[in-house]
């Protein structure tokens, strides 16, 4: 049985591998999305993105969307603009439904950072969203796969 920890202490890594790629849940200062939770997605040294969560409203899924959809950060290659040279298009910033699962792959939506960390997080559209993001400074730096597995560091 894997060690457990609180959501705020857990690090999630891609199930398919991915080197230094990590996902960490954080508290949001601006709860305008209706949730006090978000996450930081680190894809490479000096390349990190903040996402906010929009909670589910009954039948709908919870959703993760880029919290700061302006220009993407500088990549290790030093590029700011998209490879095509186009300006970022409104509304195409990365987003995905987000699903949380326990050890038996039952839904396990956390209430806050002190809640037990779910074993797995599923972001089914995130990799594709990065591929089609017009402001992506480096399409080679994108999340791999959609399943993220908890690491409590024990």
Segments and roles (model prediction):
Residues 2-79:
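N-terminal secretory signal peptides
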Residues 3-7, 13, 92, 124-125, ...:
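Alpha-helical protein-protein interaction elements
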Residues 4, 17-19, 59-61, 70, ...:
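Exposed regions on extracellular, virion, or secretory-pathway luminal proteins
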Residues 75-104:
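N-terminal leader/propeptide segments of preproteins
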Residues 100-154:
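Glycine-rich, aromatic-bearing surface loops/beta-hairpins
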């Amino acid at each position: 049985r894997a060690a457990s920890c609180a959501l705020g202490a857990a690090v999630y890594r891609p199930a398919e591998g991915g080197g230094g790629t990590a996902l960490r849940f954080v508290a949001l200062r601006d709860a305008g999305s209706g949730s006090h939770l978000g996450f930081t997605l680190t894809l490479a040294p000096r390349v990190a993105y903040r996402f906010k969560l929009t909670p589910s409203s009954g039948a709908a899924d919870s959703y993760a969307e880029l919290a700061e959809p302006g220009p993407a950060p500088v990549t290790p290659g030093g590029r700011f603009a998209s490879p095509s040279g186009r300006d970022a298009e409104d509304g195409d910033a990365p987003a995905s439904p987000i699903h949380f699962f326990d050890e038996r792959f039952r839904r396990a939506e956390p209430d806050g950072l002190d809640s037990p960390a779910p074993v797995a997080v599923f972001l089914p559209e995130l990799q594709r969203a990065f591929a089609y993001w017009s402001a992506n400074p480096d399409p080679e730096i994108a999340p791999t796969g959609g399943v993220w597995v908890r690491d409590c560091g024990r």
